[in-house]
Amino acid sequence: MFKEYKIYKFFEQVKQETYKVVWPTRKELVASTLVVVVAVFIFSLTCLVLDYSIHNIMQLLLNIGK
């Protein structure tokens, strides 16, 4: 009985807390999403350039002895 009450109390508190959440407006959500997409794109390009550079340097070093 007590355990069931604790579970009920927990979910009741979760419900109360969700009313306190300040949800973003659609404009804020779109802006934040755009920032994340651009940041991921820039990070991906950086990784691509670094990977390509390291690959070419390794190929150059491995082909020196041939």
Swiss-Prot record:
Main location: membrane
Top-rank taxon, per record: Bacteria
Listed InterPro entries: SecE_bac, SecE_sf, Translocase_SecE/Sec61-g
UniProt KW Metal-binding keyword: no
Membrane topology per record: Single-pass membrane protein
GO cellular component, as recorded: plasma membrane
Record carries keyword Repressor: no
Residues passing through the membrane, by range: 29-49
Subcellular location: Cell inner membrane
Entry's Gene Ontology BP terms: intracellular protein transmembrane transport; protein secretion; protein targeting; protein transport by the Sec complex
Pfam family, one: SecE
GO molecular function, one term: protein transmembrane transporter activity
Keywords: Cell inner membrane, Cell membrane, Membrane, Protein transport, Translocation, Transmembrane, Transmembrane helix, Transport
Subunit structure: Component of the Sec protein translocase complex. Heterotrimer consisting of SecY, SecE and SecG subunits. The heterotrimers can form oligomers, although 1 heterotrimer is thought to be able to translocate proteins. Interacts with the ribosome. Interacts with SecDF, and other proteins may be involved. Interacts with SecA.
Function, in words: Essential subunit of the Sec protein translocation channel SecYEG. Clamps together the 2 halves of SecY. May contact the channel plug during translocation.
Family recorded in the similarity comment: Belongs to the SecE/SEC61-gamma family.
NCBIfam families: secE_bact
UniProt name for this protein: Protein translocase subunit SecE
Taxonomic classification: Bacteria, Pseudomonadati, Pseudomonadota, Alphaproteobacteria, Rickettsiales
